[in-house]
Amino acid sequence: MTNWDTSSIQIYDKVIERKIRYNTTIVEHSCMLLEAKNQNIVLFHKIGTSFTMITDQNKLTIHEGSYTLAYYWKDQPYNLYIWRDKNGNYLGSYFNIVKNTCLADNLLSFEDLIIDVVVFPNGDLY
């Protein structure tokens, strides 16, 4: 059974997103809680370092100062990131296939299964 407790967090609280990669390394991001419901939460994360995802035919760069709206669901094998620039313009989306999404206190954690879908601004998928 997945641990999922929204009772101890409030809107605008700091929440740590902890991603456990397939190779067991851990990546953490400090986020702000935007919404918490029984079955899902939404986090906000400001991008501190630019990064680029490159495919055979496309490239998606998320620049420093852009932000992520991150959606997580209890008992669902995925999460969703929507990226926007500092002016709110859509940059792209990222569906992350995961397992063991847990929320306890101010920590959201999940195990990344490497299978992802990137949606580019023009609608192309990878």
Question: Where do the model's predicted regions map?
Answer:
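Conserved, surface-exposed functional patches that form binding/active-site neighborhoods
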Residues: N87, G92-Y126
